[in-house]
């Protein structure tokens, strides 16, 4: 997290300190408008010892807790700016639009859903209040029947009213009836007609702008936005053109580079090495990928319809408010005032209106229109950041001096009012800015109108909207439809034509300025006749005047110096293992990841809101192509880095020995950059080099002479976007804004200021020591700890924020920009933390629901198991009861010994049978031997008696065998088994003796013979 930076020199007189790292020090920009100057005051002596890099935020916040929050501009600064680290985040905070079109759509859908819920809750609350009033009236008049009837009637009326209001609210959400078929067909034909017109206009504009790029000309900020707008329209109108345009650009890039060398970044080198050409080609492809990624952010969502009802309502409101006789309600003013975007309003205002805004904010009113827009844009960003900080802390926490500074910074009356009045108007500003989301541009414009301070705020806004140009209404109407996915091609044509007109005006203004400079150079005042003795005496005075005039006119940093610094940085990039290209690819990957998150959030919100909005097909195709292109560029970069490593290893014999000691962080010294600039350009203006040096020093947070390549590149891009001429005063403000970003990460790519300056000198091959010193002084302002090392991200951030337009910022403006970027960095970090917390809470709730569901399933399973066990127990109890009632006959059986020989038992039984067969007299019922008779005698004389005796003998033998079998069964069967016994194999019959076998055979023969008889 960011820590505060301590500045050297005169800024040490400042005593402005923060009580909290996250909150207090963010409001420092409120005192930026004070006109007090303390440049003649000496430096402060009682500096606190510098802390180490590992100083924690908690310790720093505790040490800052007892100081005051705000001081006038005479005391503006930080005592702790020398320690802490700076990390200038390379995210969308530098851009004019903070997010993609999809993110804007998501925010709008959320706001609409929130407004609907608030309306329903308000109507329900009104219905409940009416019911309460009716019930109280019924209670008061309950003594009489007439009063009771009246109360019942009132209650029914209130219930009917609440039901009607809810029905109306429900009817609002019901889809409107479809138009007739003929009307719909005509609307579609008109839509496609304007779509074809827009297609041809886009092709013509893209061709012109691309031709300027191929010829080596730099596009201004407005031209760059126009190119992105027209390219996104081409992809939207013809989605499959992504498969044609993007591969066509990739394949023809080598051809373009060959026939149009002006599109290559100029490094003032004549080397024809293949590696150098490959690196330059990689830089161009990276620029193309960056442009396509920015175009992807500009592509809106897609809707089934083409006409927006809200856009039509806004058009009717804008037409009605411009007519003084038409009445406009306050609700309509607040509702549609939030639709005027700051960027749209600033781009559409005339020079007179811009100058009036600058006077209100006490800014410079001299300069081009582009310069006025730039400093107003910078100031509005600062005010928006301060509004969020003050709202978080509360207006009541500010003292009188802080209230005066905050009101003065917002163009409100600050002196001659009571403290309560100051708090009231500041609360009103913050409420309109944050809660009602009224743009600060309209609030500031309302201060420029000749309206009494006692007037109502809505009346001020009404008069302000009334004087806005027509272009503001067209842009806002298109933005409303675009956020809903309902793009009107006719309105888009009007906007593009208006932008083309403004581009021509800016080119004409730039051309006139160039002609004026050339005419001023050609005009020469005739020198008067001077004697030799006077000439020799005044030579020293003339040299001194020339030196002072050069230093006064060229104190600021111009776009030429920015290009010089950028070229020196790219030259150092090849020696620093292509850190610039690596950082660019890293940024592109982060941007694509953010875009993917926006798309996922759109899907979630769409399911809740039930709106038929989705990501367009062209955006999907373009996302896939850009993602594939970045992957290819990453592989090319790795290949190029490996080749450079091999070349260095082959050229240097001690490379292998020294490579292990190289720091993982790529360091670039300020002196190296200055030397590079000297090699690049041989000039006689040493002051110009001093400007770049000052810029690099300001980027050096820890003042070690080493800065990150990423920070330098971002600063170059920020200034180059506006193509600005920055004077010394604005440069100080700009650098102050960047130097306040105290948390610089040591794992970033950093660059030594000395190395950067050496490369600048070599590339320019210049002897302009004064200019080099000025550049070096600027670089030193980025060096917080004065160690000669700054981060490239600091420089890139500054230069990207300034942009492409031809303006010139002072040192003060650069310091203010550094401060602004620091505030945006902290607020963005807090927003990311809040978003991460919300996401983690959502995931925790989802996980909790899953755990609860699993617990419910587990508890259900346990209950089922308990029920099953209970049923089993009941069945067992029933079986036990049945066993007790039925007699157990198995217990009567004798238990067979477990290891008793069954064969022996069978043998004993066989012996019993043998004895029974041999001794029939043992049976008392058996017949005697005398009555039997012999065979022949029986056959002749006693036939019937002998036959009956044979039958009796057979029945006796059968009964004996049955009894023996029953006894054997009782011995074999178990006596304790209740259920069905298992299948028991029949044991093999043991071998019997020959005597038993013969007896059995004789017995069977006798029985058979008797049966036959």
Curated annotation (Swiss-Prot):
Residues 935-945 have a biased composition (Gly residues). The keyword Zinc does not apply. SUPFAM superfamilies: EF-hand. Residues 104-131, 488-525, 573-653, 823-919 form a coiled coil. It comes from Drosophila melanogaster (Fruit fly). It holds the Pfam family LETM1_RBD. This is Mitochondrial proton/calcium exchanger protein. Disulfide bonds: none annotated. One of its GO terms (biological process) is neurotransmitter secretion. The chain crosses the membrane at residues 237-257. The keyword Mitochondrion applies. Mitochondrial proton/calcium antiporter that mediates proton-dependent calcium efflux from mitochondrion. It is found in: Mitochondrion inner membrane. Residues 877-926, 960-970 have a biased composition (Basic and acidic residues). Gene3D superfamilies: EF-hand. Ca(2+) 1 binds at residues 700, 702, 704, 711. Ca(2+) 2 binds at residues 783, 785, 787, 794. GO terms for cellular component: mitochondrial inner membrane; mitochondrial membrane; mitochondrion; presynapse. Keywords: Antiport, Calcium, Calcium transport, Coiled coil, Ion transport, Membrane, Metal-binding, Mitochondrion, Mitochondrion inner membrane, Repeat, Transit peptide, Transmembrane, Transmembrane helix, Transport. It is a single-pass membrane protein. Residues 687-722, 770-805 form the EF-hand domain.
């Amino acid at each position: 997290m960011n820590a505060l930076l301590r500045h050297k020199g005169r800024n040490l007189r400042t005593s402005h300190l923060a009580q909290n790292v996250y909150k207090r020090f963010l409001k420092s920009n409120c005192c930026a408008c004070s006109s007090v100057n303390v440049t003649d005051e000496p430096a402060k002596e009682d500096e606190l010892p510098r802390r180490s890099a590992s100083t924690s935020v908690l310790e720093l916040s505790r040490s800052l807790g007892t100081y005051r929050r705000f001081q006038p501009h005479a005391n503006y600064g930080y005592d702790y700016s020398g320690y802490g680290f700076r990390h200038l985040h390379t995210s969308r905070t530098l851009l004019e639009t903070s997010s993609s079109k999809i993110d804007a759509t998501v925010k709008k859908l959320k706001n609409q859903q929130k407004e609907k819920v608030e309306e329903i809750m308000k109507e329900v609350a009104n219905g409940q209040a009416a019911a309460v009033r009716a019930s109280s009236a019924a209670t008061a008049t309950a003594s009489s029947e007439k009063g009771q009837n009246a109360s019942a009637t009132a209650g029914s009326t209130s219930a009917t009213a609440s039901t009607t209001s809810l029905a109306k609210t429900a009817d609002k959400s019901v889809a409107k009836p479809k138009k007739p078929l003929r009307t719909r067909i005509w609307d579609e034909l008109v839509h496609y007609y304007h779509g074809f017109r827009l297609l041809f206009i886009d092709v013509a504009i893209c061709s012109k702008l691309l031709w300027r790029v191929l010829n080596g000309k730099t596009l201004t900020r407005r031209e760059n936005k126009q190119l992105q707008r027209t390219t996104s329209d081409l992809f939207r109108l013809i989605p499959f053109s992504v498969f044609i345009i993007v591969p066509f650009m990739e394949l023809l890039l080598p051809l373009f580079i060959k026939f149009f060398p002006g599109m290559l970044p100029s490094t003032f080198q004549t080397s024809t090495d293949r590696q150098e050409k490959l690196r330059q080609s990689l830089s161009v492809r990276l620029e193309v990928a960056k442009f396509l990624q920015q175009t992807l952010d500009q592509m809106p969502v897609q809707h089934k319809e083409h006409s927006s009802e809200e856009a039509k309502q806004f058009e009717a409101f804008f037409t009605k408010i411009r007519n003084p006789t038409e009445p406009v309600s306050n609700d309509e003013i607040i509702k549609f005032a939030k639709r005027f975007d700051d960027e749209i309003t600033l781009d559409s205002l005339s020079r007179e209106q811009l100058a009036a805004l600058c006077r209100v904010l006490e800014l410079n009113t001299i300069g081009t229109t582009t310069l006025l827009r730039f400093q107003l844009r910078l100031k509005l960003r600062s005010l928006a950041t301060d509004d969020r900080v003050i709202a978080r802390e509360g207006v009541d926490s500010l003292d009188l001096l802080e209230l005066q500074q905050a009101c003065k910074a917002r163009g409100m009356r600050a002196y001659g009012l009571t403290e309560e009045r100051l708090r009231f108007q500041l609360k009103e500003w913050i409420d309109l800015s944050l809660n009602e989301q009224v743009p600060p541009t309209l609030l500031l414009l309302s201060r420029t109108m000749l309206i009494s301070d006692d007037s109502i705020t809505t009346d001020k806004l009404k008069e302000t909207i009334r004087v806005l140009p027509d272009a503001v209404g067209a842009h806002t109407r298109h933005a409303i439809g675009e956020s809903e996915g309902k793009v009107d091609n006719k309105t888009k044509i009007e906007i593009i034509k208006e932008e083309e007109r403004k581009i021509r005006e800016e080119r004409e203004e730039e051309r006139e300025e160039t002609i004026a400079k050339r005419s001023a150079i050609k005009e020469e005042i005739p020198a008067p006749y001077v004697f030799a003795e006077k000439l020799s005496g005044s030579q020293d005075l003339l040299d001194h005047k020339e030196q002072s005039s050069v230093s006064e006119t060229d104190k600021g940093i111009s776009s030429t110096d920015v290009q010089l610094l950028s070229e020196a940085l790219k030259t150092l990039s090849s020696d620093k293992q292509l850190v610039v290209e690596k950082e660019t690819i890293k940024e592109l990957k982060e941007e694509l990841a953010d875009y993917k998150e926006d798309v996922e959030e759109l899907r979630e919100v769409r399911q809740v809101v039930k709106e038929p909005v989705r990501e367009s097909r062209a955006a999907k195709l373009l996302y896939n192509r850009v993602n594939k292109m970045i992957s290819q560029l990453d592989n090319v970069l790795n290949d190029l880095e490996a080749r450079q490593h091999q070349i260095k290893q082959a050229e240097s014999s001690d490379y292998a020995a020294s490579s292990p000691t190289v720091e993982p962080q790529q360091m670039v010294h300020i002196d190296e950059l200055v030397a590079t600039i000297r090699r690049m350009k041989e000039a006689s203006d040493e002051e110009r080099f001093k400007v770049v040096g000052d810029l690099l020093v300001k980027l050096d947070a820890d003042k070690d002479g080493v800065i990150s390549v990423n920070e330098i590149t971002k600063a170059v891009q920020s200034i180059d976007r506006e193509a600005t001429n920055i004077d010394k005063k604005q440069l100080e403000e700009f650098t102050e804004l960047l130097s306040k970003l105290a948390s610089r990460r040591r794992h970033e790519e950093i660059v030594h200021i000395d190395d950067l300056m050496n490369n600048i000198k070599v590339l320019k091959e210049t002897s302009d020591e004064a200019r080099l010193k000025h550049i070096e002084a600027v670089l030193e302002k980025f060096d917080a700890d004065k160690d000669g090392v700054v981060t490239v991200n600091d420089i890139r951030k500054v230069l990207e924020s300034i942009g492409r337009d031809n303006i010139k910022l002072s040192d003060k403006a650069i310091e203010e920009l550094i401060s602004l970027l620091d505030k945006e960095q902290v607020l963005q970090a807090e927003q990311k933390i809040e978003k991460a917390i919300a996401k983690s809470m959502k995931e925790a709730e989802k996980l909790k629901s899953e755990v609860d569901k699993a617990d419910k399933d587990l508890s259900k399973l346990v209950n089922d198991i308990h029920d099953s066990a209970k049923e089993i127990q009941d069945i067992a109890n029933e079986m036990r009861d049945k066993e007790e009632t039925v007699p157990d006959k198995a217990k009567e059986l004798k238990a067979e010994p477990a290891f008793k020989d069954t064969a022996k038992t069978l043998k004993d039984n066989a012996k019993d049978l043998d004895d029974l067969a041999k001794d029939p007299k043992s049976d008392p019922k058996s017949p005697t031997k005398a009555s039997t008779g012999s065979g022949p005698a029986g056959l002749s004389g006693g036939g019937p008696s002998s036959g009956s005796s044979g039958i009796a003998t057979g029945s006796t033998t059968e009964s004996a065998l049955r009894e023996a079998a029953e006894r054997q069964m009782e011995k074999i069967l178990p006596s304790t088994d209740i259920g069905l016994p298992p299948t028991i194999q029949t044991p093999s019959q043991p071998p019997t003796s020959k005597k038993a076998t013969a007896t059995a055979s004789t017995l069977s023969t006798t029985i058979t013979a008797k049966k036959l008889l």
